Amino acid sequence: MAKKGMLEREKKRQNLVYKYNSRRQALKNSIKYSSSFSETSLLKKELEKLPLNSMKIRLRNRCFVTGKPRGFYRNFGLSRNMLRYMGHECLIPGLMKASW
């Protein structure tokens, strides 16, 4: 289990990303299509004023059961340990253990 503080921090980041996503995209597009250097530098200053945790790159994929960040399977939203456990308990529809 991940620490509760870490999970809360991750939730806060997700909320910030959701809140500032449209504004960040608008600023990036205007920077991309700006014609003058001074306009570009002003827009970059505006972009820098946004919170650092509002960047999507700061998010970390976590298991929704345990909150573990490592060994994460995107298709299931689970860590490797929980995927194995839930697979053996037949809790994931369509998942079968390989045998050949």
Swiss-Prot record:
Cellular component GO terms held in the UniProt record: chloroplast; small ribosomal subunit
DNA repair listed as a keyword: no
Keywords per UniProt: Chloroplast, Plastid, Ribonucleoprotein, Ribosomal protein, RNA-binding, rRNA-binding
UniProt-listed PANTHER family: 30S RIBOSOMAL PROTEIN S14, SMALL RIBOSOMAL SUBUNIT PROTEIN US14M
Subcellular location: Plastid, Chloroplast
Membership in a protein family: Belongs to the universal ribosomal protein uS14 family.
InterPro entries cross-referenced by the UniProt entry: Ribosomal_uS14, Ribosomal_uS14_bac/plastid, Ribosomal_uS14_CS
BP GO annotations: translation
This protein's record includes keyword Nucleotide-binding: no
Name of the protein in question: Small ribosomal subunit protein uS14c
Native source species: Bigelowiella natans (Pedinomonas minutissima)
Quaternary structure annotation from Swiss-Prot or TrEMBL: Part of the 30S ribosomal subunit.
Role this protein plays: Binds 16S rRNA, required for the assembly of 30S particles.
Alphabetical list of Pfam families matching this protein: Ribosomal_S14 (PF00253)
Gene Ontology molecular function: any one: structural constituent of ribosome
Domain of life (superkingdom): Eukaryota
